[in-house]
């Protein structure tokens, strides 16, 4: 029998502004994807700490050795877009450590609406915004909102408390994105997480 070298793990990015719920989304996605048999690992990016990585390692949701941290310095977008070599190296190290790895999740440091991922780093990426940031975020048409493969609007439970018209915000997001997918979530409560996992599966894991 001829030996077959396994394909490299699929690589996805999760970006968005500070406090939008990126880490909370990952914490909810990990058990859902693992329950579907997905072998995964996570690379976090913080400015000068490893705070998000340590949070995931302490969570009990994933083997701590499957979480790597990249310290991005003053510009979190640089290490996911202009020069992603640190993240690429971290991903390669995890693939070498876990040969059966199917999915690598790269969490960007908190950034602004201009944050995007290099396609040298990821195959597909999610941008997370939240209703507390205001329902005008989709109208501002930042590159993160427009170019991501999936836009997640998080913290939808807060909409009535911050005066946001959630249905209008979702409709505006769908309009400016030209029909590309938008999913509403409450990551802390687990609402919408299965839909995000489904989107990841269809896009990069080739599940129905």
Swiss-Prot record:
Localization in the cell: Cytoplasm
Annotated Pfam families: cobW
Gene3D superfamilies the UniProt entry points to: P-loop containing nucleotide triphosphate hydrolases (3.40.50.300)
Keywords: Chaperone, Cytoplasm, GTP-binding, Nickel insertion, Nucleotide-binding, Plasmid
Annotated Gene Ontology cellular component terms: cytoplasm
Keyword field contains Transmembrane helix: no
Primary localization class, coarse: cytoplasm
GO molecular function: GTP binding; GTPase activity; nickel cation binding
Superkingdom: Bacteria
Single GO biological process annotation from the record: urea catabolic process
Residues that bind GTP: 16-23
Family: Belongs to the SIMIBI class G3E GTPase family. UreG subfamily.
Purpose of the protein: Facilitates the functional incorporation of the urease nickel metallocenter. This process requires GTP hydrolysis, probably effectuated by UreG.
Oligomer and partners: Homodimer. UreD, UreF and UreG form a complex that acts as a GTP-hydrolysis-dependent molecular chaperone, activating the urease apoprotein by helping to assemble the nickel containing metallocenter of UreC. The UreE protein probably delivers the nickel.
The protein's name: Urease accessory protein UreG 2
Species assigned in the record: Methylobacterium radiotolerans (strain ATCC 27329 / DSM 1819 / JCM 2831 / NBRC 15690 / NCIMB 10815 / 0-1)
């Amino acid at each position: 029998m001829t030996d077959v070298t396994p394909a490299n793990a699929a690589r996805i990015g999760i970006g968005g502004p500070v406090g939008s719920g990126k880490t909370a989304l990952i914490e909810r996605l990990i058990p859902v994807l693992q329950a579907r048999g997905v072998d995964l690992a996570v690379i976090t990016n913080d400015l000068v700490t490893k705070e998000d990585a340590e949070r995931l390692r302490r969570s009990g949701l994933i083997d701590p050795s499957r979480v790597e941290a990249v310290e991005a310095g003053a510009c979190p977008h640089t290490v996911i877009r202009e020069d992603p070599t640190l993240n690429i190296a971290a991903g390669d190290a995890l693939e070498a450590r876990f040969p059966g790895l199917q999915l690598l999740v790269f969490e960007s440091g908190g950034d602004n609406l201009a944050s995007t991922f290099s396609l040298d780093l990821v195959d597909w990426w999610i941008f997370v915004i939240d209703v507390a940031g205001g329902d005008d975020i989709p109208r501002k048409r930042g590159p993160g909102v427009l170019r991501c493969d999936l836009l997640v609007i998080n913290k939808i439970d807060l909409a009535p408390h911050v005066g946001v018209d959630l249905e209008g915000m979702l409709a505006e997001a769908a309009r400016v994105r030209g029909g590309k997918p938008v999913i509403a979530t409450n990551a802390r409560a687990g609402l919408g997480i299965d839909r995000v996992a489904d989107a990841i599966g269809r896009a990069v894991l080739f599940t129905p």
